Amino acid sequence: MLDNVLRIATRQSPLALWQAHYVKDALMATHPGLTVELVPMVTRGDVILDTPLAKVGGKGLFVKELEIALLEKRADIAVHSMKDVPVAFPDGLGLVTICEREDPRDAFVSNKYHSLDDLPAGSIVGTSSLRRQCQLAERRPDLIIRSLRGNVGTRLGKLDNGDYDAIILAVAGLKRLGLESRIRTALPPDVSLPAVGQGAVGIECRLDDARTQALLAPLNHSQTALRVTAERAMNTRLEGGCQVPIGSYAEIINGEIWLRALVGAPDGSVMVRGERRGSPEQAEQMGISLAEELLENGARAILTEVYNGETPA
């Protein structure tokens, strides 16, 4: 980093800019005298909006350009929504800080209906997520689920135009953008298990940049980091990209981690679920062992068929 200046690589969507400003404000409050600059960038994920994520390479599309900026030293850190962060990092880069988690649940958003169960048969529901799609299809096979891309404002605009009867978004994103009033119902994890890391903001930087890592250290939230560690360990063992139907959610209750996970066929016809409880020190191992249980119980076949563009029978 330059003398007393730290540069943040960020996407230009309203939510990405909110996250970057959140980290900027936290850094400046923690380190008076530090100058923090934003380096806004356009990623392929922001440009390719007419194709479902699963068909164009998944959410890694949202981080690659930011990582190139780090490697070329045009920026010092990149701020990500943790649910968009792939399981692997380029050589020399790593996730060094995870900030305190916002509400991780999915939100049911509709102008006409109060809840998922209120939707009449044949209603059109929008989501770009195979994870949300498989859980919706399992619970309500009578609904029509259609792809929905774009930033939060774009998606709400499509709902308001009447293209959809309801859409599913992240509670955290709506709250951060001051749009909490659009949430009709926050879906509990047993109805819609969140994505890995959903609601958490992560910070990536060069692993040889000790000075930047020291500046970031006070922003790390240990309980959130433990929860996300368990979730990501499971996802890594499943070799799950961000475009596959995998849900994973860890809570810390009475000092113990409770990790729940699922892998589902996109049409909701097959769902494999599991859970683990253990001490925080076991977070990573819990994620790995739960993933292995899911693979043995049918997740391997589901994921193989999803990667091959097929639907399990």
UniProtKB/Swiss-Prot annotation:
Enzyme class: transferase
Reaction equation(s) it catalyzes: 4 porphobilinogen + H2O = hydroxymethylbilane + 4 NH4(+)
Cofactor entry: dipyrromethane
Keywords associated with the record: Porphyrin biosynthesis, Transferase
Entries under CDD domains matching the protein: PBP2_EcHMBS_like (cd13646)
The EC number(s) this enzyme carries: 2.5.1.61
Cofactor annotation comment: Binds 1 dipyrromethane group covalently.
Recorded metabolic or biological pathway in which this protein acts: Porphyrin-containing compound metabolism; protoporphyrin-IX biosynthesis; coproporphyrinogen-III from 5-aminolevulinate: step 2/4
GO terms classed as biological process: heme biosynthetic process; protoporphyrinogen IX biosynthetic process
Gene Ontology cellular-component annotations: cytoplasm
Free-text function comment from the UniProt entry: Tetrapolymerization of the monopyrrole PBG into the hydroxymethylbilane pre-uroporphyrinogen in several discrete steps.
Cross-referenced HAMAP family: Porphobil_deam (MF_00260)
UniProt subunit comment: Monomer.
Note: The porphobilinogen subunits are added to the dipyrromethane group.
Family: Belongs to the HMBS family.
Protein name from the UniProt record: Porphobilinogen deaminase
Organism from which the protein derives: Salmonella typhimurium (strain LT2 / SGSC1412 / ATCC 700720)
Organism ancestry: Bacteria, Pseudomonadati, Pseudomonadota, Gammaproteobacteria, Enterobacterales
